[in-house]
Structure formats: structure tokens, C-alpha cells
Amino acid sequence: MDRTTLPYGLFGLDIDPYKEFGATVELLSFLPSDFFPSVRDLLDTASALYRESLESSDHCSPHHTALRQAILCWGELMTLATWVGNNLEDPASRDLVVNYVNTNMGLKIRQLLWFHISCLTFGRETVLEYLVSFGVWIRTPPAYRPPNAPILSTLPETTVVRRRGRSPRRRTPSPRRRRSQSPRRRRSASPASQC
């Protein structure tokens, strides 16, 4: 078993922390590691936006629960890192542990925090659409893709318009339609046609 996949493949279980939310570890892996803000920035954002609901004893949403768990895991990991730093005599070994935690576990926590904060902020469907859009963009050869990657904060505007379906019907028919309709062909509006 590869050591870098151990947290999600622990004890032979195929556990993907994003699966129940419609995403996968692979889908998030399209985003480069420097895309994700620092853990400190993400924790500050979560606290500023969702402190009350995160501290509440009420169940708000699965994203709140997952966010609580990620924050608690990071706290425990920092406690362990502090203990290792204070108790491991060999500086080279200490540096290896700290670097491993920051590089591997830090990235996984940053991904989890970003995903759940983004889902709470923008909506799960928008975040999933963004991940797919970015995945398509990054895999498209540079010569055939737009120069700039999709931006999550701009997706809700386009997503909302597209999700509403067709644009509302105009109240007045076009002149062409008005001329072509004869009195005997006009129908009274039925409840089904008003949807």
C-alpha cells in the first residue's frame, strides 16, 4: 500500500471523503496544491462565515459536520506535531515529520476545508460544476483552451441562468405570431400550459 494514500485507504477500506457529496479525491486533485489557501486562512474564513453554526449543537448540514471534523482533525494533528517537535531528539527526523505533515496532511486538510467552505458559500452543485470545468480546462491542450482557468466566484451567475431552463415567455406575442393566429386556432390557457 502506498503511504501517501494511507489515510483514504486505511485498513483496506476504499474511503473517499468527498464521495457522499458527489465529488472524488481525483476530481479535487486536478486543482494544483498552490490553489488552496493556507489552513490558517481557511480556518479564519470558516470562523468568520460559519462560526455560529459550527459551534452550535444543532445539525445544520453534512457540510457543517464534515467541516467540524476536518477542523478537529487538524487540531489533533497540530497537537501531535507539537508533541513530536518537543519529544523527538533528532532534528533531521523532526524535520521529516513536520515536512510530511505540512506537505501531505496539510494539503488534504486544505482540500477538505476548501471544499466544504465553498459548498456552504456557493452551493454544492456550483462547486461540482467548477471542479468538472477546471478538470476539463486543465486537461485540454493549451492551444485549444481559453488562457484563464474557470473562476469559482463567477460560476453562480452563469449557473443560475442556465439552471432556470428556458427564458420566461414574453407576455406579448411577436408580430409574426399575431398575424398567423386565427380566432378558431387560439386555445384557452389550460393549467398545464401555464407551467
Swiss-Prot record:
It is found in: Virion; Host cytoplasm. Sequence repeats lie at residues 167-172, 174-180, 182-188. One of its GO terms (cellular component) is T=4 icosahedral viral capsid. Residues 148-195 are annotated as: Disordered. A motif (Bipartite nuclear localization signal) lies at residues 170-187. Residues 189-195 are annotated as: RNA binding. Residues 161-188 have a biased composition (Basic residues). Keywords: Capsid protein, Cytoplasmic inwards viral transport, DNA-binding, Host cytoplasm, Host-virus interaction, Microtubular inwards viral transport, Phosphoprotein, Repeat, RNA-binding, T=4 icosahedral capsid protein, Viral penetration into host nucleus, Virion, Virus entry into host cell. Pfam families: Hepatitis_core. InterPro entries: Hepatitis_core, Viral_capsid_core_dom_sf_HBV. One of its GO terms (molecular function) is DNA binding. Residues 167-188 are annotated as: 3 X 7 AA repeats of S-P-R-R-R-[PR]-S. Phosphorylated by host SRPK1, SRPK2, and maybe protein kinase C or GAPDH. Phosphorylation is critical for pregenomic RNA packaging. Protein kinase C phosphorylation is stimulated by HBx protein and may play a role in transport of the viral genome to the nucleus at the late step during the viral replication cycle. GO terms for biological process: microtubule-dependent intracellular transport of viral material towards nucleus; symbiont entry into host cell; viral penetration into host nucleus. The modification Phosphoserine is found at S167, S174, S182. Self assembles to form an icosahedral capsid. Most capsids appear to be large particles with an icosahedral symmetry of T=4 and consist of 240 copies of capsid protein, though a fraction forms smaller T=3 particles consisting of 180 capsid proteins. Entering capsids are transported along microtubules to the nucleus. Phosphorylation of the capsid is thought to induce exposure of nuclear localization signal in the C-terminal portion of the capsid protein that allows binding to the nuclear pore complex via the importin (karyopherin-) alpha and beta. Homodimerizes, then multimerizes. Interacts with cytosol exposed regions of viral L glycoprotein present in the reticulum-to-Golgi compartment. Interacts with human FLNB. Phosphorylated form interacts with host importin alpha; this interaction depends on the exposure of the NLS, which itself depends upon genome maturation and/or phosphorylation of the capsid protein. Interacts with host NUP153. Belongs to the orthohepadnavirus core antigen family. This is Capsid protein.
